[in-house]
């Protein structure tokens, strides 16, 4: 019987890489995103048009409800919560509605879809959920306050739910990538941040699927960011926030 995977944010760099890799592993695909044109192109490119496409804006209640309905009618073996975006600038000067939409996509949608998928997975006694967090969530990040806070939630939420789900045969993996070569930082208007070299999304997805195969609960990619994770865990948070502000302010 063919296994099925649902990928949110499927038309972005990481989502496309997941689509290619999972198709190669024999998964049937449900590809979701906001653009019918981009989803159709992706389905045709990856599967010859056999993948199911679902147009849904996860920044809206209607979009979230659309995917809840899909998951309830078509339980999946693997859920990839990849959709997300960030904004850049001082919080007081950013559009509040846009920041709330960011939380809706990064937190509310992810939490809702995880809850929905877990219902069928725990009943079946198997399944896996991959939630894409970020190394940005390791520390308070001035100029990306909402984004860093949302990704801290994703990481901690995934680890906690993963412990609960394990006894039901369900695996939850929290993935914390560093900068990845995608359109994210164009969307975030964060060109001023000195990021260094960005990772290839194909490499991130390969590492994620290896971690999934090994039943790991958490992945930090590339591995050098485990150092950042350790340091931010022992240093005073106020000091870490000030240091992050200095780094993000470099031109």
Where are these regions (language model features)?
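Conserved glycine-rich cofactor-binding loop
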Residues: 11-12
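Conserved glycine-rich Rossmann-like NAD(P)H-binding loop of the short-chain dehydrogenase/reductase
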Residues: 25-42
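Conserved NAD(P)H cofactor-binding loop of Rossmann-fold oxidoreductase domains
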Residues: 82-87
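Substrate-binding pocket helix/loop in short-chain dehydrogenase/reductase
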Residues: 90-92, 98-103
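Active-site helix of classical SDR
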Residues: 114, 150
């Amino acid at each position: 019987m063919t296994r099925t995977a649902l990928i949110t944010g499927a038309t972005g760099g990481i989502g496309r890489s997941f689509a290619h890799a999972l198709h190669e592993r024999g998964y049937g695909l449900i590809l979701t995103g906001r653009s019918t044109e981009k989803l159709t192109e992706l389905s045709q490119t990856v599967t010859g048009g056999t993948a199911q496409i679902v147009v849904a804006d996860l920044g809206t209640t209607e979009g979230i409800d659309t995917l809840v309905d899909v998951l309830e009618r078509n339980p999946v073996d693997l859920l990839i919560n990849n959709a997300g975006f960030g904004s850049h600038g001082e919080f007081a000067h950013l559009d509040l509605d846009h920041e709330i939409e960011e939380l809706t996509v990064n937190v509310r949608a992810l939490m809702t879809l995880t809850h929905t998928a877990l219902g069928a997975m725990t009943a079946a006694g198997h399944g896996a959920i991959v939630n894409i967090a970020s190394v940005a969530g390791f520390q308070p990040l001035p100029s990306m306050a909402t984004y860093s806070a949302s990704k801290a939630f994703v990481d901690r939420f995934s680890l906690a739910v993963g412990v609960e789900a394990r006894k039901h045969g369900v695996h939850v993996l929290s993935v914390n990538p560093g900068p990845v070569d995608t359109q994210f930082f164009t969307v975030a208007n964060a060109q001023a941040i000195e990021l260094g070299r960005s990772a290839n999304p194909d490499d991130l997805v390969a590492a994620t699927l290896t971690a999934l195969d090994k039943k790991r609960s958490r992945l930090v990619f590339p591995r050098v960011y485990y150092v950042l994770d350790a340091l931010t865990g022992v240093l005073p948070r106020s000091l870490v926030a000030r240091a992050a502000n200095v780094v993000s302010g470099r031109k």
